[in-house]
């Protein structure tokens, strides 16, 4: 059964690496189901064959962090948002636990490494397709990649996340190249892939990934040279000199090859114009509302709107993520979440460093062999962890399944790097082992049931959006109906269906008792109930209430929207339209002019305050020109 669990595990990693590459769960569900099966089989097996003892301290910190994040997600104000973090967390826990336990045998770790290299090859192939000019290419038919042209993305929707994935796998490959067991042909292939990944990171033009790569490379070099100093001191100075020459020449070549590309990135998106500082201010403002436990899972979706900085350019889109995982952790999970995350990182990094020390002081003296896959993966995992943590200062890769699961794999390698013998006796915490198995079972059940209860609804919502883009109103309606039927608690499906129904009504059909209007109002009211923090839901419901002559209730929703989006043209303009419909022209004019002062403007080509204000002036002029009624 253990081998069956590991086969499902490898398939889950592969599917997630290809499909689980964006922040929504839509394409993660197949990989989630496979990982759930792997975890369930492992749980039923209960006593797994573990070749080496894992660190109970690492397991304890991971249990505390996972338990807290899962509990906070369960108690979050918007279940649909929390679901995204919860399922990625469950997948990460299964990956972590199976890496620590069932996959502790060297051959299974090599198999995991082979899956990662397969994903690297796939990402490089898709990256070449992007580089050839087909920037919107997506591996799933009928879906398009929405990222900016000029930056490769591989399987990922966001090029920065491809950079994160490459920088993690690159150091595992570098560790295997330097200290892993294998022939010359394998090492040559690894060297080629490492260079390809370095070029790939440069072609993503992700400055955060490049920074993480540089710092990770520095740590890798220091640790590798330290190992050589402890074990093969006669080679140290030769390797140091050769390493410096290769680093300088390699860096110069990479810079020259990608110079024009990186300069173009700086021209189109200069560092001086980076808006991250303003986004970070919004995250800190949300954190201040609930410092200890945060606002809840992914509540920065709406917090980025409510606490938007006035310094952001007026036409800048909504951030949705803090572009800094540590500030996002503070905003969503508070100080408790961040402190537990730091404990997890420290425990695993310490265990990895302890293994390197044990290997050089004990294992090497016993065997006389420096080549070791365990040493290779531990060294690579430490450098990859460092690169990942640096990159996380600028990005949100832990809100995407594939990089998160890769990070969980790195932590698993560090939690059980391969200690053996009696030279090092680790602290045993028996209750922790039981808790890890219970969490593994719960996470597995969640991953198996999630695609059925939520994945089908996500699928129908995506199909409805495709139908809308193709202007197929009937198909859109059918898909939205199916989405709501599959998951009645999906606020986005409710909102989209209510909005679609409102859009079908002609002016003469917007009467209080019209059945379509009633149905639209019910959907929008349910969407607001399920997610009272999304200002667009409140605005749509206000529009429906106005059509039903429920003007006071409409005004309440408009005031709610103004609290949720205080700087936005859309919410101010909706208030003006409300007064305009009621014939209160002075209030309407004041609201339109207030909308013109908004710090967050609607996109060009969409409904704008000035267009509606002109309609108001025309309306007033027509009224004045009309002869007075007797």
Model region roles, listed by residue range:
Residues 158, 277-319, 326-329, 333-340:
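TM-adjacent membrane-interface loops and short helices in multi-pass inner/ER membrane proteins
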Residues 461-630:
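C-terminal luminal/periplasmic domains and tails of membrane-associated envelope-modifying transferases
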Residues 154, 264-269, 313-315, 367-374, ...:
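Short beta-alpha connecting loops at secondary-structure transitions
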Residues 143, 147-155, 213-217, 249-288, ...:
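Flexible juxtamembrane loops connecting transmembrane helices in multi-pass membrane enzymes
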Residues 135, 221, 307-311, 504, ...:
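A short secondary-structure junction motif
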Residues 274-277, 298, 321, 470, ...:
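Soluble non-cytosolic domains of exported or imported proteins
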Residues 1-70, 74-84, 92-118, 176-191, ...:
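Transmembrane signal-anchor hairpin modules in multi-pass inner-membrane enzymes, especially those
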Residues 1-19, 30-43, 66-73, 84-98, ...:
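Alpha-helical transmembrane segments of multi-pass inner-membrane proteins
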């Amino acid at each position: 059964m253990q081998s069956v669990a590991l086969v499902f595990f490898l398939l889950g990693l592969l599917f997630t690496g290809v499909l689980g590459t964006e922040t929504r769960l839509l394409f993660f569900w197949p990989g989630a189901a496979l990982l759930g099966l792997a975890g369930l089989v492992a749980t039923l097996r209960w006593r797994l064959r573990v070749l080496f003892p894992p660190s109970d301290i690492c397991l304890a910190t991971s249990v505390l962090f996972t338990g807290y994040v899962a509990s906070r997600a369960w108690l979050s104000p918007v279940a649909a948002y929390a679901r995204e973090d919860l399922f990625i967390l469950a997948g990460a826990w299964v990956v972590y636990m199976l890496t620590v336990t069932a996959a502790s045998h060297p051959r299974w770790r090599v198999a995991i490494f082979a899956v990662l290299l397969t994903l690297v090859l796939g990402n490089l192939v898709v990256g070449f397709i992007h580089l050839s000019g087909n920037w919107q290419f997506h591996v799933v038919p009928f879906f398009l990649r929405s990222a900016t042209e000029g930056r490769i993305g591989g399987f990922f929707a966001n090029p920065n996340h491809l950079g994160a994935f490459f920088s993690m796998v690159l150091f595992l490959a570098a560790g295997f190249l330097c200290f892993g067991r294998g022939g010359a042909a394998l090492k040559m292939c690894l060297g080629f892939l490492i260079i390809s990944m370095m070029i790939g990171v440069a072609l993503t033009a992700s400055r955060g990934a490049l920074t993480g790569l540089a710092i990770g490379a520095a740590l890798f070099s220091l640790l590798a040279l330290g190992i050589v100093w402890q074990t093969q001191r006669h080679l140290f100075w030769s390797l140091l000199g050769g390493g410096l020459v290769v680093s300088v020449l390699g860096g110069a070549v990479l810079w020259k090859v990608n110079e024009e590309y990186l300069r173009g990135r700086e021209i189109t998106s200069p560092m001086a114009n980076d808006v991250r500082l303003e986004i970070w201010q919004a995250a800190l403002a949300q954190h201040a509302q609930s410092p200890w436990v945060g606002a809840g899972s992914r509540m920065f979706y709406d917090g980025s709107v409510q606490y938007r900085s006035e310094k952001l350019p007026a036409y800048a889109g909504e951030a949705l993520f803090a572009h800094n995982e540590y500030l996002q952790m503070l905003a969503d999970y508070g100080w408790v979440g961040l402190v537990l995350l730091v404990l997890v990182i420290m425990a695993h990094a310490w265990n990895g460093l302890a293994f390197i020390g044990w290997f050089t002081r004990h294992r090497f003296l016993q065997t006389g062999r420096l080549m070791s896959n365990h040493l290779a993966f531990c060294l690579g995992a430490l450098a990859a962890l460092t690169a990942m943590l640096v990159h996380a200062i600028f990005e949100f890769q832990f809100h995407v399944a594939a990089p998160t699961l890769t990070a969980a794999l790195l932590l698993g390698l560090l939690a059980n790097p391969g200690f053996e013998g009696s030279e090092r006796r680790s602290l045993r915490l028996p209750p922790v082992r039981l808790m890890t198995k219970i969490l593994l079972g719960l996470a597995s059940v969640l991953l198996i049931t999630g695609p059925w209860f939520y994945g089908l609804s996500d699928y129908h919502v995506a199909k409805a959006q495709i139908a809308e883009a193709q202007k197929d109103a009937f198909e859109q309606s059918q898909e939205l109906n199916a989405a709501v039927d599959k998951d009645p608690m999906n606020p986005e499906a409710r909102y989209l269906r209510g909005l679609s129904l409102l859009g079908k009504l002609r002016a003469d059909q917007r009467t209080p008792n019209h059945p379509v209007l009633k149905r639209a109002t019910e959907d929008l009211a349910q969407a607001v109930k399920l997610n009272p923090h999304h200002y667009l839901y409140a605005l749509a419901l206000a529009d429906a209430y106005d059509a039903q002559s429920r003007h006071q209730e409409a005004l309440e929703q408009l005031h709610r929207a103004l609290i949720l989006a205080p700087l936005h043209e859309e919410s101010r303009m909706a208030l003006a339209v409300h007064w305009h419909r009621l014939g209160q022209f002075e209030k309407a004019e004041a609201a339109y002019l207030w909308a013109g002062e908004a710090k967050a403007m609607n996109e060009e080509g969409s409904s704008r305050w000035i267009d509606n204000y002109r309609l108001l002036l025309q309306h007033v002029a027509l009224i004045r020109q009309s002869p007075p009624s007797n």
